[in-house]
């Protein structure tokens, strides 16, 4: 294995692990019921905090893309990662709804969008020859993260309280981002893996680059926005409520609810990794069509 191959493999894993830290959001469902019981919050008010997070992730994604052109990747990831962990930590002191919305909804949401966007960008740019594979590996690692953290989070809540659980998640994320970010960097603009050559010009001559303004004027952009928004919302609803629904409607205890989050993570991870690799062979749109058809 060449040094260059080894290095991009390390960067891929570190970027994926940074993305996995943002997947702490996927264990939100184990916090909802304890949070309501601790402070008397209504289910609607607690659920709206997650809605704010998702909105902020969508709005901050373009900011992350802009920052990638202005500062080194490891600096952006470190700063945004610390902000992400700080949001979780401060949520441990959120005894009122406004504080919950600011610390968790706004701070965690904005920093999550920046970190998530950057993690995937780093992963795929180091693998121009296997973009689907790199994207699949990164997303799979992010997806299986709750398999380990959901039971641990539930154990902390049961042995201490929900506030301390938020504090611990926050500190863990801050330390994780600081350590992992040190290994991140973007490849040079002309980077290409050893033994791989970009497609001939004749194969890519129909590709056209758009500015942000031009992109917003195309019907294709709005079609994709509606499509991806619908798919993402479906997944987010499942992720944010799987434990709570199991406890409230199926009578599960907290430990079983956390186990459900883990099972969901396994299925999610296998799908992301497999479909990412398949898309390199079958094509992006064809794979997407099959995946959505099966899900529906």
What are these regions (language model features)?
Residues 26, 54-62, 146-147, 265-273:
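Residue-level signature of mid-helix packing/kink "hotspots" within the transmembrane helices
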Residues 59-98, 279-285:
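Conserved MFS/SLC helix-loop-helix module at the cytosolic interface between two early adjacent transmembrane helices
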């Amino acid at each position: 294995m060449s040094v260059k191959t080894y290095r991009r493999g390390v960067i891929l894993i570190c970027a994926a692990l940074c993305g996995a830290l943002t997947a702490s959001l996927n264990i939100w469902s184990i916090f909802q019921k304890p949070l309501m019981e601790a402070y008397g919050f209504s289910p609607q008010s607690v659920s709206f905090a997650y809605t704010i997070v998702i909105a902020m992730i969508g709005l901050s994604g373009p900011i992350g893309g802009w920052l990638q052109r202005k500062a080194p990747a490891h600096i952006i990831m470190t700063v945004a990662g610390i902000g992400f962990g700080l949001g979780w930590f401060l949520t441990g002191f959120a005894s009122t709804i406004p504080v919950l919305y600011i610390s968790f909804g706004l701070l965690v949401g904005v920093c999550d969008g920046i970190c998530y966007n950057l993690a995937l960008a780093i992963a795929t740019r180091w693998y121009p020859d296997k973009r689907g594979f790199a994207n699949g590996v990164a997303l799979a690692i992010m997806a299986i993260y709750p398999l380990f953290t959901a039971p641990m989070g539930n154990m902390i809540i049961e042995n201490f309280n929900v506030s301390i659980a938020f504090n611990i998640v926050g500190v863990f994320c801050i330390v994780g981002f600081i350590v992992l970010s040190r290994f991140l960097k973007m490849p040079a603009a002309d980077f290409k893996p050893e033994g791989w050559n970009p497609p001939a010009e004749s194969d890519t001559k129909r590709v056209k680059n758009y500015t942000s303004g031009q992109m917003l004027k195309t019907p294709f952009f709005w079609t994709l926005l509606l499509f991806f928004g619908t798919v993402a919302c479906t997944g987010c609803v499942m992720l944010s409520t799987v434990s709570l629904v199991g406890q409230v409607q199926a009578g599960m205890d907290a430990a079983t609810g956390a186990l459900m989050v883990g099972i969901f993570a396994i299925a999610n991870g296998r799908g992301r990794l497999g479909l990412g690799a398949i898309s390199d062979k079958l094509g992006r749109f064809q794979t997407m069509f099959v995946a959505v058809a099966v899900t529906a």
